[in-house]
Amino acid sequence: MNWYENEVQRLEKVKGNLPYDPKMVFYGSSSIRLWDSLYEDFGTYKPVNLGFGGSTLAACVWFFDRLVGMYHPESIIVYAGDNDLGDGRHPEEVCIFFRQLVACVRDRFGDIPLAYISIKPSITRWSIVDNIRFTNSLISAEIEAKGGNLHYINVYDRMTDQTGYPRREFLDPDGLHISPKGYDLWKEVVGQYIATSIHDQRIS
C-alpha cells in the first residue's frame, strides 16, 4: 500500500483547512477525489472529501483508521471497487472488502448511515462490465439483507443508455473518469439519497 502514501499524507492535512468539524465523509477512489464541486454541492451537510486516486476497496479498509478515524462523522458515503476489478480481483473478493469496510465503520462509529455508490459503467473497462454488474448485484444484495442504516446508491443504471452502454456525456474523453455532466448526475442521485435518508444533518 506504499504507493498511496503521498495521497494519504495529503488527506491527513485536509482537516486543518476546514472551517467546520465534518459530519459527512465522502470516501473512496478518484471518482470522489475529482468531484471538484462536492463541497459546494453538499456544503450544508459539512462534508469532507477523502478520495484518493487509484484507491481500491481494499485500500479503503487499510487506511480507514488513519483517514476516516480522525473525524466524528454522522454519515459516510463510499465509492470504490472498480479499481479492484481493474486490478484483476474477482467480484466475490470485492464484496469481502466491502464487508470489511462496513465492519470498520460499525466498530468505530456504530450504526451511522453508510451508503455505497454503485460501481459506475465506463467505456475503458467495458471488457469487465459483467464483473462490474455482478459486483454491484452482490453488494446490493448484501446491503438489502443487512438493512438498517446501510444503503445502496445506484448510479450505474442512470449512466447507461437504452442498450446498456455507458452514456458518453457522463464520462471524460478518457472513457473512465467522470465528466462535469456526470457529476451533475451524481449530485442529483446522491442528493436524493441524502434528502430521504439523512436530511437531519443539514446545518442549522
How does the language model describe each region?
Residues 50, 117, 153-156:
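Conserved beta-strand termini and adjacent loop/short-helix elements that scaffold enzyme active sites
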Residues 124-204:
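Catalytic His-Asp segment of secreted/periplasmic serine-dependent ester chemistry enzymes
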